[in-house]
Swiss-Prot record:
GO terms for molecular function: DNA binding; protein heterodimerization activity; structural constituent of chromatin. Monoubiquitination of Lys-121 by the RNF20/40 complex gives a specific tag for epigenetic transcriptional activation and is also prerequisite for histone H3 'Lys-4' and 'Lys-79' methylation. Keywords: Acetylation, Chromosome, DNA-binding, Isopeptide bond, Nucleosome core, Nucleus, Phosphoprotein, Ubl conjugation. This is Histone H2B. Residues 1-36 are annotated as: Disordered. There is a cross-link at K121 (Glycyl lysine isopeptide (Lys-Gly) (interchain with G-Cter in ubiquitin)). CDD domains: HFD_H2B.
Length: 126
């Protein structure tokens, strides 16, 4: 019975570089498709909060799944809110309301204040 193919080890500390595969002579080199992830951003936040702490690739994978899950929940809720109010555009207001409804108490307050700060910084830089 043939053994299942083993996958390549996960890249360390949020690297997103393209990896090239080498094949037989005469064949062209084929680049691996880029895997998008939030790992570089998770790593940056980790270093802001705990500069001397590292993170394993397994833990980084869990954090990436978590961020993707929260993103999908917020986007879905914001989409529903826009639809209920007969709007075709998701604005920062829909995102803010979605965050308030999805996240509990103090966490929602912090998320809203950080989001407002980010939007203000973005609009002032334009």
């Amino acid at each position: 019975m043939p053994e299942p193919a083993k996958s390549a080890p996960a890249p360390k500390k949020g690297s997103k570089k393209a990896v090239t595969k080498t094949q037989k002579k005469g064949d062209k080199k084929r680049k691996k498709s880029r895997k998008e992830s939030y790992s570089i951003y998770v790593y940056k936040v980790l270093k802001q909060v705990h500069p001397d702490t590292g993170i394993s690739s397994k833990a980084m994978g869990i954090m990436n799944s978590f961020v993707n899950d929260i993103f999908e929940r917020i986007a879905g809720e914001a989409s529903r809110l826009a639809h209920y109010n007969k709007r075709s555009t998701i604005t920062s207001r829909e995102i803010q309301t979605a965050v308030r409804s999805l996240l509990p108490g103090e966490l929602a307050k912090h998320a809203v204040s950080e989001g407002t700060k980010a939007v203000t910084k973005y609009t002032s830089s334009k």
